[in-house]
Swiss-Prot record:
Keyword Lipoprotein: no
Record keyword DNA damage present: no
One term under GO cellular component: ribonucleoprotein complex
Protein name according to UniProt: Large ribosomal subunit protein bL34
Family of this protein: Belongs to the bacterial ribosomal protein bL34 family.
Keywords: Ribonucleoprotein, Ribosomal protein
Database matches in NCBIfam families: rpmH_bact (TIGR01030)
Pfam families xref list: Ribosomal_L34
PROSITE patterns the UniProt entry points to: RIBOSOMAL_L34
Regions that span the bilayer: none
Length: 44
């Protein structure tokens, strides 16, 4: 059985990237929460 994590920067960005987050209401909530917490990296 192959390993479950087969990294792809493009796939990762499409699901977890900044634009993906901003595309939905809940995604914007995630960014807002991370800003409030003072995270240096807001998204992938």
């Amino acid at each position: 059985m192959k390993r479950t994590w087969q990294p792809s920067k493009l796939k990762h960005a499409r699901v977890h990237g900044f634009r993906a987050r901003m595309a939905t209401k809940n995604g914007r909530k995630v960014i807002k929460a991370r800003r409030a917490k003072g995270r240096v990296r807001l998204s992938a």
